[in-house]
């Protein structure tokens, strides 16, 4: 059978919090089968757990948060969640000694390296996927996102940014998902922001960790980072990275075709909730062997070596 995945060992890293600008220690721990993805704040006494759950997601101006019933939150979970989706990690406990996951370089790549460093272990329990059975679409003004049935996981994302740094030919990206494709084509794409927004937020004591080290920064005309872009279409690739993380908030890889136009965290989450709320639109599936499994979810050679 296709088995659930966790880590082989505990790994730790430090980074800077986007909001506070303070050092954050991140610890990733293996977890037993059917645990799911658990985010944990150890700076609170007692520590507070936040299971990844579409209904717990709140989108703020700066990041995605998970919020519990007591309005306690953990922030900036989206890029780590994308790395978990990319490598198909089903069970993990993620600890931080702060109210937020460190921003690292603004992409998912540092988290991918950390997960690969820990090693991926298979558990003796069938991995559950969410398979889309009917088309589900959500809209917000001219923005929209939808899932259609498809035997794999495909993504097609279009942005509409009227900015000199973003050529019109670099506003759409489409791919057939796989762990290898995610690592090569998506994981390194960084988040982005306007210099004026960062300066304004920092003047109000917000976004204190924001810098050229953790984002693509633009003014009205150009990219300000000395090293430029990692891909010509890094902006839309990062929006796809965000979507991969947002859609994994149900704790399962999804089998279906995702298409979006100008979508963001809030609309991606709205789509996920709309799918899960419509019982006839999806089903849980497991697979007995590799031959049945959609190519999208075969483990990359580097992972289970």
Swiss-Prot record:
Catalytically driven reaction(s): a UDP-3-O-[(3R)-3-hydroxyacyl]-N-acetyl-alpha-D-glucosamine + H2O = a UDP-3-O-[(3R)-3-hydroxyacyl]-alpha-D-glucosamine + acetate
Enzyme nomenclature, EC number: 3.5.1.108
GO cellular component: membrane
GO molecular function list: metal ion binding; UDP-3-O-acyl-N-acetylglucosamine deacetylase activity
Binding site for Zn(2+): 79, 238, 242
Active site: residue positions: 265
Pathway: Glycolipid biosynthesis; lipid IV(A) biosynthesis; lipid IV(A) from (3R)-3-hydroxytetradecanoyl-[acyl-carrier-protein] and UDP-N-acetyl-alpha-D-glucosamine: step 2/6
Pfam families: LpxC
Reported cofactor(s): Zn(2+)
Gene Ontology annotations of biological process type: lipid A biosynthetic process
InterPro entries in alphabetical order: Ribosomal_Su5_D2-typ_SF, UDP-acyl_GlcNac_deAcase, UDP-acyl_GlcNac_deAcase_C, UDP-acyl_N-AcGlcN_deAcase_N
Superkingdom in the source lineage: Bacteria
Keywords: Hydrolase, Lipid A biosynthesis, Lipid biosynthesis, Lipid metabolism, Metal-binding, Zinc
Function: Catalyzes the hydrolysis of UDP-3-O-myristoyl-N-acetylglucosamine to form UDP-3-O-myristoylglucosamine and acetate, the committed step in lipid A biosynthesis.
NCBIfam families: lpxC (TIGR00325)
PANTHER family, per the entry: UDP-3-O-ACYL-N-ACETYLGLUCOSAMINE DEACETYLASE 1, MITOCHONDRIAL-RELATED
Family per record: Belongs to the LpxC family.
Annotated HAMAP family: LpxC
Official protein name in the record: UDP-3-O-acyl-N-acetylglucosamine deacetylase
Provenance organism: Escherichia coli O45:K1 (strain S88 / ExPEC)
């Amino acid at each position: 059978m296709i088995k659930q995945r966790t880590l082989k060992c505990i790994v730790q890293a430090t980074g800077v919090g986007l909001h506070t600008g303070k050092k954050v220690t991140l610890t990733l721990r293996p977890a037993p089968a059917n645990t799911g993805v658990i985010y944990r704040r150890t700076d609170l006494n007692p520590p507070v757990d936040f299971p990844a759950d579409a209904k717990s997601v709140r989108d703020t101006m700066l990041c995605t948060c998970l919020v519990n019933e007591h309005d306690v939150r953990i922030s900036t979970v989206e890029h780590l969640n994308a790395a978990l989706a990319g490598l198909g990690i089903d069970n993990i406990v993620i600890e931080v000694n702060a109210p937020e996951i460190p921003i690292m370089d603004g992409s998912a790549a540092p988290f991918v390296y950390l997960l690969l460093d820990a090693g991926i272990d298979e558990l003796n329990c069938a991995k559950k996927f969410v398979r889309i059975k009917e088309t589900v679409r959500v809209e917000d003004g001219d923005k929209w996102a939808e899932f259609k049935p498809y035997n794999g996981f495909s993504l097609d994302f279009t942005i509409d940014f009227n900015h000199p740094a973003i050529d019109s030919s670099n506003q759409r990206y489409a791919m057939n998902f796989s762990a290898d494709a995610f690592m090569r084509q998506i994981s390194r794409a960084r988040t982005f922001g306007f210099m004026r927004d960062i300066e304004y937020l920092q003047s109000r004591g917000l976004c204190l960790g924001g810098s050229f080290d953790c984002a693509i920064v633009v003014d009205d005309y150009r990219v300000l980072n000395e090293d430029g872009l990692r891909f010509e279409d890094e902006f839309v690739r990062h929006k796809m990275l965000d979507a991969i993380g947002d859609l994994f908030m149900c704790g399962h890889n999804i089998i279906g075709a995702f298409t979006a136009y100008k979508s963001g965290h809030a609309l991606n989450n709205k789509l996920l909730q709309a799918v899960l709320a419509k019982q006839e639109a999806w089903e849980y599936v497991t697979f007995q062997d590799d031959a049945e499994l959609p190519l999208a979810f075969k483990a990359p050679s580097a992972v289970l070596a």
